[in-house]
Amino acid sequence: MARARPPPPPSPPPGLLPLLPPLLLLPLLLLPAGCRALEETLMDTKWVTSELAWTSHPESGWEEVSGYDEAMNPIRTYQVCNVRESSQNNWLRTGFIWRRDVQRVYVELKFTVRDCNSIPNIPGSCKETFNLFYYEADSDVASASSPFWMENPYVKVDTIAPDESFSRLDAGRVNTKVRSFGPLSKAGFYLAFQDQGACMSLISVRAFYKKCASTTAGFALFPETLTGAEPTSLVIAPGTCIPNAVEVSVPLKLYCNGDGEWMVPVGACTCATGHEPAAKESQCRPCPPGSYKAKQGEGPCLPCPPNSRTTSPAASICTCHNNFYRADSDSADSACTTVPSPPRGVISNVNETSLILEWSEPRDLGGRDDLLYNVICKKCHGAGGASACSRCDDNVEFVPRQLGLTERRVHISHLLAHTRYTFEVQAVNGVSGKSPLPPRYAAVNITTNQAAPSEVPTLRLHSSSGSSLTLSWAPPERPNGVILDYEMKYFEKSEGIASTVTSQMNSVQLDGLRPDARYVVQVRARTVAGYGQYSRPAEFETTSERGSGAQQLQEQLPLIVGSATAGLVFVVAVVVIAIVCLRKQRHGSDSEYTEKLQQYIAPGMKVYIDPFTYEDPNEAVREFAKEIDVSCVKIEEVIGAGEFGEVCRGRLKQPGRREVFVAIKTLKVGYTERQRRDFLSEASIMGQFDHPNIIRLEGVVTKSRPVMILTEFMENCALDSFLRLNDGQFTVIQLVGMLRGIAAGMKYLSEMNYVHRDLAARNILVNSNLVCKVSDFGLSRFLEDDPSDPTYTSSLGGKIPIRWTAPEAIAYRKFTSASDVWSYGIVMWEVMSYGERPYWDMSNQDVINAVEQDYRLPPPMDCPTALHQLMLDCWVRDRNLRPKFSQIVNTLDKLIRNAASLKVIASAQSGMSQPLLDRTVPDYTTFTTVGDWLDAIKMGRYKESFVSAGFASFDLVAQMTAEDLLRIGVTLAGHQKKILSSIQDMRLQMNQTLPVQV
């Protein structure tokens, strides 16, 4: 059968050139450098000069011919043109093509097709299309008859149609088509072409794959990446920061799409400190000497600030010149500064034993504006030089203060008379502590004038009779010379007519007095400068005429009282021993069960029952927790992880009830029976509680997997993280309201005789209305060791949250409602500090030691005094003296009703720089006299002052103020602070038996 004329292959002769016009050069969309897709060729017939020798079926179908391309290079092509015969099925198969691990292959076809209408006398079966197929194999296994020449096993890619066909008189028009197929999984593949009645030439076939070229973007390097199996696939390419760059967000990756183009960058790098961007974000160049860059980022290097330099590249900070420094609070871009020069023009004005110093500002402030002054006092001996001078005593007083002065004037008093002093006025600023040299100063030498002695501190009564008083006193603290004698003034209180007596000793006997009369006595010392001031009035009383008999009885009274007391103690001891023995015999077998049950019986009172007292713990679950059908539960998302598994948010829709959000705790796969029991014990505990400030149990799922506990959903999650997220956003009343809710929940638990053991802000949940609810029941005892989380520390076989736990619970595992009160005080501190970590970065052992030494947390910033006092009440060492939760609720209610009481703010500031408060509290009830108490706090020197001023009882001492201390002669600020602090503790002990007052 004669064939129609097929489209001729390209060849050099001019007559045939019109059949193969030059290929149309389509414009390419230029991609940025480094972002253009790469194409790797697997097979290209354009470069084959020998026979292709592809397999055709039947042999009368496709025919291999030679030709030339547009550059006159010889090429091998295939053509077919059996258009005059119907039902054509001509197949052509390439050789085996190795896949090279790519998943998707592209095929570029260049061909010409003759227009069927241009061929005369052909049947209607003439076509202008052909089909493209492929067949996968692990090796070159194809033969002339295998695989079968049909669509299955061959996989069809597409039917290829030309954009343009040509007629007999037209020049051949070359069509270019690109198709792709995948995913591929075997070692290689064959391409196959099916002709069903077309007149065409297959000029060239190219099989290739695409990949994204290696690129640099956003200071990160991304490697060459093969495209995915589908045209829409996005293949992740992990990136690495370029040299001298650091990650600023992770993960660092770029997506390679099916066209071999990069898109969707995730994460980023930026230039590290000491480096600046260069070459369009493809380099991070070191800062040259003389410049620096303190922060990572895309900013440029900056010239060094004044008085600083760099000697090497890539500097993140410029070092200061010699004798120039930066303070710790100065930023890296701050200029280096130096210490100030000495103050100028120091003027002294001496008045007896006091002094006023004034001076002018230094000539050079060192380039800073934080100038302060210190005044150093040195007392000099003899006529020697500076080596004969030593620091002044602590009783020298500086007003307004000695160190850190902002004023250029200071008043100095309580100096010794006739004494030579040297005063150094130092100028310091923020970098003085950085300098190895001492601060610069201006010195002035002065000599104090003659001065009278200071006041005699105290008077003591040695003995009294019906007509005499024997008295003694301590010398003045500042005699200001040699004491010549003492003058005593005394008078009967009812008459007021004074008499005087002189003594060269510091004691005297007053005779000729009336019996049973009260006398007022004062004494003063005299030197060559004259008399000093009289001491404060002291009152003493003579005895009556019957005093001798009474005195004898008084001498025997201790013996009588001691004997009676010893007898009473013996009787009580015998009775106690007998009672203890009887109780041990009667209740010995039941004590362990009773303590474990943690309940007491009261008419009409619901009590907590420990689920671990059940022989079968599952019985407790059935009794206290409602079983929920798993079909009613829908888990939406995982919101966290717990000790036993994941914590999820979900919905609960029970028949006849509206759908509600719930929190779902799940038990992880592979649990043991003990883990299941421990997990469900929380539900057994929670199911016994019904209070608006206790997390509500919705039910449990135990009849399917996973096992679940469902509770009400709290939108704002844990209180500590919620407060940190909203730092400073709430009023004090709102915070107190949160504390009141927590206290109300704990009051309910304590009334049910339940001890929480792990009360902390992390275990308080907050809903959308800021209602706080106590949660996490019973799980802390099962926590596993986690060295990375020091919150819980092993102690006596269990896990204890040291920072929140009372001392007796840490030492003896003695958990009670009183230990929960201690933990509640820590929660108060967490709330008022907006979620700060208690005791900051102190180790657990340091916390234990500090609490044992009676140190307590200071008030958080802007914390009302009343709230911090309530915290301190919760942290009293003796658990019996801590307030009950009912008292705490009443106190907070009063504070909320009386908002003005919350405006008194504690002066201490929260933070790492604030030391713990020393709360050493001597028990005043163990002291017989006020003097014993003063000795205990190492203030015994003031015993006579207290007694002579009339402060002889603890009730009176508890009412003393700072003015009272000044009046009785306690003038040193440190001593005043120590005594007042102990008085405050004394008041606390006196009030512990009563509800906390507001």
From Swiss-Prot:
Report any one BP term from Gene Ontology: dendritic spine morphogenesis
Any one Gene Ontology MF annotation carried by this entry is: ephrin receptor activity
Motif (PDZ-binding) positions are 996-998
User: Keyword S-adenosyl-L-methionine: yes or no?
Assistant: no
The segment(s) forming the Eph LBD domain are 39-217
Q: Which GO terms describe its cellular component?
A: cytosol; dendrite; extracellular region; plasma membrane
Q: How is it modified after translation?
A: Phosphorylated. Autophosphorylates upon ligand-binding. Autophosphorylation on Tyr-614 is required for interaction with SH2 domain-containing proteins. Ubiquitinated by RNF186, mainly through 'Lys-48' and 'Lys-63'-linked polyubiquitin chains.
Which is an annotated Pfam family here?
EphA2_TM
Q: Keyword set for this entry?
A: Angiogenesis, ATP-binding, Cell membrane, Cell projection, Developmental protein, Disulfide bond, Glycoprotein, Kinase, Membrane, Neurogenesis, Nucleotide-binding, Phosphoprotein, Receptor, Repeat, Signal, Transferase, Transmembrane, Transmembrane helix, Tyrosine-protein kinase, Ubl conjugation
Residue intervals on the Extracellular side:
34-559
Disulfide-bonded cysteine pairs: these are C81-C199
User: Reaction catalysed by this chain?
Assistant: L-tyrosyl-[protein] + ATP = O-phospho-L-tyrosyl-[protein] + ADP + H(+)
Which Enzyme Commission number(s) are on file for it?
A: 2.7.10.1
User: Transmembrane stretches, by residue range?
Assistant: 560-580
PANTHER family (UniProt xref): EPH RECEPTOR A5, EPHRIN TYPE-B RECEPTOR 3
This protein's assembly is summarised as: Heterotetramer upon binding of the ligand. The heterotetramer is composed of an ephrin dimer and a receptor dimer. Oligomerization is probably required to induce biological responses.
Q: What is this protein called?
A: Ephrin type-B receptor 3
